[in-house]
């Protein structure tokens, strides 16, 4: 197994957007990918920008965490902001991001495994008919590619302040995890 996870596992801050607003990339990844019509476009900031609402919620949640833990620094783990990093950095000007890159031939199967692992644990995903599984996997595959393409487009077109983002290569990190 690539990932050991379940529906109750605490993985990132991203699920809080799903549970707070019944919206966000997790809504698409876990639920709307099954829809007859492909609804991925709903999660394009150019089509429907929820970043102000989402960032306000993250700010509230993070402030509560800082107060309750008597801390001064918040370290979040988010992957969905890759669709709109310029807006995130505008809303959180003191933020510093680590953006992990990985060979697409490895990251896509890893992302698919993470989500289908949760779905299998809750709903028995791998027991569904092959056609239903493939329909879902195709949709999720395209969504995961879209996340990478959006970051890349913002990066090469200088919409991301490169002084606030450090790109970390997954393979290099795994070779020297302690260093």
Located regions from the model:
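PAPS-dependent sulfation machinery
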Residues: 1-74
């Amino acid at each position: 197994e690539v990932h050991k996870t379940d529906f109750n596992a605490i993985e990132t801050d991203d699920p809080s957007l799903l549970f707070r607003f019944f919206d966000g990339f997790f809504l698409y990844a876990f639920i709307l990918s099954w829809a007859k019509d492909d609804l991925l476009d709903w999660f394009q900031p150019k089509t429907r920008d929820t970043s102000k609402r989402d960032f306000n919620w993250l700010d509230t949640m993070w402030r509560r965490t800082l107060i309750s833990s008597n801390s001064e620094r918040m370290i979040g783990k988010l992957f969905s902001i890759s669709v709109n990093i310029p807006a995130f950095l505008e809303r959180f000007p003191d933020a510093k991001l680590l953006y992990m890159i990985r060979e697409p031939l490895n990251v896509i199967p890893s992302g698919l495994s993470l989500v289908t692992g949760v779905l299998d644990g809750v709903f028995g995903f791998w027991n569904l008919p092959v056609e239903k599984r493939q329909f879902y996997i195709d949709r999720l595959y395209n969504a995961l590619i879209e996340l990478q393409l959006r970051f890349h487009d913002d990066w090469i077109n200088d919409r991301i302040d490169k002084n606030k983002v450090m790109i970390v290569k997954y393979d290099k990190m795994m070779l020297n995890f302690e260093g």
